[in-house]
Amino acid sequence: MFIYVKIYLMKVIVGFGNPGSKYNFTRHNLGFLALDFYAKIHQLNWQNKPKFNAIVAKDDEHDLLLVKAQTYYNEVGLSVRTILDFYKLKAQDILAICDDFNLEFGKIRFRERGSAGGNNGLKSITTHLGTDDFPRLRIGTANDSLRSKIGDTDFVLSRFNDAEYEKLPEVLREIGDFIVKY
């Protein structure tokens, strides 16, 4: 007699952003935008999961759980910790997707681990998991002329300009391709 056991190796893809329509299409919500784009392409449905303080979508084909924490950007670690505990996963099983105003607009940088580099969402995950040993994908949102005029806080909450908005689908497609290969 044979017993077959399926080992479930799920990855959790966490897109950073702030809940609420007033933050739609802001630089800080690029993680949410990336997951929304991916979910649309793969015909996934979002579900509210209050126990995770998040909205999630499952991609069974690729063994992924997409997560948009509803805690606000700087407290994303609360949701991540709850999800990892629930599914009995490790920090290395997540992929954090966040904006980075120090990277050229649309540039994508992947790291297996590392410091938060000033990103409060990454700091929150590091604090709640007790490690910075988790993968992250930083997406460039740099616009130095605008940032120098309005400051960092207002910059990350600013909307994309027309030229950036036009390039956005290409950037989101590239992120989606990365997620599938990840």
Show the residue positions of the predicted features.
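Hydrophobic alpha-helical segments within soluble ligand-binding/sensing domains
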Residues: 118-121
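Catalytic tyrosine of NAD(P)H-dependent dehydrogenase/reductases that use a Tyr as the general acid/base
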Residues: 115
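Nucleotide and nucleotide-moiety/phosphate-recognizing core
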Residues: 2-112, 123, 127, 133-137, ...
